[in-house]
């Protein structure tokens, strides 16, 4: 069986990639990722049985999290690294089995699809199995759709859990749920209704995961605050850090202090500037470039080393191949991968030494952008915001969180932001902001018309803000507030955000630029009928719809 992947918005023809991923992953990489998911379900099976006899292994929890994160779109293209993880997972599974058996447990449980017992000794055996366990192994279209909706939610949740765990914050209940759910989506006895309920329950734990990460980030680095971020360059050599992991950012800033090397953020690392703890670093120079999909040009013109801490990495170009490093879940064949020691410390000295030999970044723009409007900062402005709503100065909020991407159709979001009436405010998080965060959209009574809460996980902040506004205005539901949801999605973190919003009862969310290919017509119908999920059409008609005109 050839590869099949339809987990991201850009999947071929909005149906699925079957020869090579639009993201750039090869058939072999797609298949080894499928196999990694399969053996991770096997490890989860044994972990579930372990919990029944009192065995909770934090290393196993971490392995499950890391395995899921690695398979997120644009995270890891390194076949050998993923194959090694498959082998390591099989070893961990067998070791855990022995411990469960010694405690009197049944280590393989129901062993759905043989995931707790299958093994291999050669690469050929692995690839043969990989061809049998992909998405299309589930023949029923609706069951497949629901299973993948849940699976992609778990992948997004895994990303948020990994970042929280890197900062020493954890929640066993989330790990237990994830392991149980990985096994349930192999269970052919579960009906579509039961899987739909499981998808919403995944959203509940998505909220827990985002809350945990918010606590981890803010307790470690302080609450984000209103910040102006330089988008120009200095004359020193620099290191560009991309992705989402704030712990990696902290270690890089510590190690570059006093070296004469500046640090710039890229993409989803931009919100690092909003945290008080990072403002003490004079060499934290600014943000370089835009969203992930423009990295081919921007990494070339940056001139210095690039550190990818998480997705999104795209196929590496010759113009910067010798300057790009990966860490964490990221991998790309031929790039140096930096691992942490047993204490979580990463030595970035080789990146720093390389930076010293490089030219300063080439300037591609100048000026400043403003962000830092996470829940704590916005609630500090609550009186000002409430007064503006009551006076009519603010007519409506538009949640335009989510992702950016290559598709020309995403220009819709820039045009939508430009044409919004001057009495509206955009609430955003994630890299979708790059479509409009540099536009001169002005302010309302001193409140910027684009309030950037931060990274995609900071969509949690937008939920907290909405719930607080509902409380202030005395409404029974966030759906009664003057808030519309026009969200751009791309990958699996957007899926867990969506499921979290649905769990919280948010209705009438519009997704674009296309609805997910993994939603079968029947599953899409359920989401439309029960939650008011919709797509987008064109700016003029959609704006009339949102504004009730």
Swiss-Prot record:
Any single biological process term in GO: response to hydrogen peroxide
Keywords of this entry: 4Fe-4S, Cytoplasm, Iron, Iron-sulfur, Metal-binding, Oxidoreductase
Keyword Protease (UniProt): no
Positions of post-translational Cysteine persulfide modification: 403
Subcellular location per the Swiss-Prot or TrEMBL entry: Cytoplasm
Positions of hybrid [4Fe-2O-2S] cluster binding: 244, 268, 312, 403, 431, 456, 491, 493
Keyword 4Fe-4S: yes
GO cellular component, one term: cytoplasm
Domain of life of the organism encoding this protein: Bacteria
GO molecular function, one term: peroxidase activity
Catalytic reactions on record: A + NH4(+) + H2O = hydroxylamine + AH2 + H(+)
InterPro entries membership: HCP/CODH (IPR004137), Hydroxylam_reduct (IPR010048), Prismane-like_a/b-sand (IPR016099), Prismane-like_sf (IPR011254), Prismane_a-bundle (IPR016100)
Cofactor(s) the record lists: [4Fe-4S] cluster; hybrid [4Fe-2O-2S] cluster
Details of cofactor binding: Binds 1 [4Fe-4S] cluster.
EC assignment: 1.7.99.1
Amino acids binding [4Fe-4S] cluster: 5, 8, 17, 23
Family according to the record: Belongs to the HCP family.
Function: Catalyzes the reduction of hydroxylamine to form NH(3) and H(2)O.
Name of this protein: Hydroxylamine reductase
The species this protein was found in: Clostridium perfringens (strain 13 / Type A)
This protein's encoding gene: hcp
